């Protein structure tokens, strides 16, 4: 006889009644499930499907919980390892002998280190972490050379925490000096160029103070009325134009990040995208000689490529047909009115159709065969399918040269610019910035008679500048090949060789705003001065000339200050912070286009610089473009 024997043997439904021979041999959960199934079967309808779906959801939920637990365990183990490494670093006794006071040292690269009596390592004890470069944040700071440490030990000052923890140098021959002007010595630094310059400047200011122009003063006055920012940026003394070191570093940090797009899938900087566009544009120049095979090689060709590009742009503007963007901006993007973020999020990373049709560089590249077709226009379905299958446009010069330059960095994952159009847009904007730099920096010679009073000693002190100049230097000569009086002006060529190239060698992810924060500040100021608003792109009044209301416009809107608040405020979410950053980036693009579209860009830049930033001549302009500020000394 079976263990479960029914009292009534009926074929309709099997219910087990109490019986002396019935023995229950199933777990409680199985019995509960049988009861639920019976109840569902009796109710009918959609109850059975709901129960089955609940079971499926519970099974997937258990699997997800197990995966989550595994990931949390892995993360905790990794965190424990990193904490152990940090404890080991903190426990290490890496004491350095005392050296000279933290100062950015000056020494030309042609001189041996031992020949300079003040050779040492520059440190920035009060520089915020946010101002360090991304390369330093990943690989660690540059180690101090052994002879520099020995010289530091002979002079007698304490080293900074950054210098103590820098035990391994960066791989390769990475320069730690930059040259800005031909008539000044090179600036030698440790890891953070601008942070150490600012720190040295404020350390030397014992009997004097600095003013940085009316733009910085208006920013200080606007923040002074807000108790939180007054405390964060150490604001005081509203009766003078001086600002605190914290506020200056906050502004410079915001300007450096204008073209640094904060997304995980951004694989190219705007400088690398511009190099790809330039090498495809100038492919005819490589006939008869070895073409460039790296971004560094393209950057070295900037003095030859940009003049040719400027001439072609001038001819294209002279033969312009069709409407021009508001304010006669030939470098404008026709974004949709509801565009809030820089990165296109739909349509296969394509912008709104018509975005590039009023940009002079796109028209020029289309005529020269750099771009096979304008992005978003007249795309044939068969061609689009073929492009997606092959990964590049048929006979696409830009894709071929991009792969040549970037295959060593990205392998096979080199983006196609006409499909991932954020790279095309960033490259075009960077090209516009480089064109503006070439036009304004080579407008006059640094050896001409000066009208300004700023000198490099105002930044680093007279002791650091003395004895560290170039051959001849400001005392009455020029370096061979860069003569201002005996040859054509070559300020831009000097920057390319001794500033842009060395910085890219240190950090291949550097962007144009990190190289020239002063250029970003000028462009944003010009955009705000015009009254343009990225949230009202179709407003015709927003593209006007702006009259002379420079100060009135600046007092009403300051996207740089908005981004500073978004960076340091916990009230901003990630999307809101990204929106504020992109608004600043849109202002930067619009301002560059306006400055380049005027007949004399040098005159417009000079007007903005002299009225807002203490810039009076080409020598001061070069330092302002590189540093993002220009101090004017005032005795206490």
From Swiss-Prot:
GO biological process, one term: symbiont entry into host cell
Signal peptide: none
InterPro entries: Herpes_UL25
Keyword Hydrolase: no
Keywords: Capsid protein, Host nucleus, Host-virus interaction, Viral genome packaging, Viral penetration into host nucleus, Viral release from host cell, Virion, Virus entry into host cell
Transmembrane spans: none
Region (Disordered): 97-125
Pfam families from the UniProt entry: Herpes_UL25 (PF01499)
Region (Interaction with major capsid protein/MCP): 1-48
GO CC terms: host cell; host cell nucleus; viral capsid; viral tegument
Main localization (coarse): virion
Biological role stated in the UniProt entry: Capsid vertex-specific component that plays a role during viral DNA encapsidation, assuring correct genome cleavage and presumably stabilizing capsids that contain full-length viral genomes. Participates in the interaction between the capsid and the tegument through interaction with the large tegument protein/LTP.
Subunit structure: Heterodimerizes with CVC1. Interacts with major capsid protein/MCP and triplex capsid protein 1/TRX1 at the pentamer vertices. Interacts with the large tegument protein/LTP.
Stated family: Belongs to the herpesviridae CVC2 protein family.
Protein name per Swiss-Prot or TrEMBL: Capsid vertex component 2
Organism: Human cytomegalovirus (strain Merlin) (HHV-5)
